[in-house]
């Protein structure tokens, strides 16, 4: 088994197929289902619980206690995660890091046609909170390491897996940041593979494209304040501050920003 198989797995796990699945695919489906159906929202879920479930599967596959490191803080006990390592043969080669986040965006049952925390296969697709962002990738990475371990495969460089929390919410405990600041030894690597890319399948389910993200969007926030001479609301003036502000916002909404090529996009 080569690292190409790991990347191909990321492509194959997109739309669900109705055909009979192999035993190894069924094992992945079971892992994926368990992870998706574990509530990891900030309000009522637990990334720590999800990490423990994935850790238990890794250990059952043959990973030792020393190969799996759990982390959480006393202030945020439910927002923990894990780092696991599959040791390679070349001790001079720096590891690769597989990164995925376990937390998901809030999901209110009344807003969903289906239960957001029950994995449903329908019309060739999986439905539930986190099926794509980012539990598909977390499940793929975990399953890949399990398969490698069970087959006895040892890569040249070690492979590290980091399952973290806090990606979806700005003010939440950020597991990836905490690891970088407090346990850089756990995630030290030559390079990392994270979410942001994507794949494409043809009509028969064959992978035909693997896209890679090479940049991240950024934002700019502006505070707009409009004033006008005071007066009583019973006698509104034509130059009302609210009208002027709404007109400005409308202009921004109607503006089409030009397409800009950066050195990165030009290279591709």
Model-inferred region functions:
Residues 1-9:
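Sec-dependent signal peptide recognition
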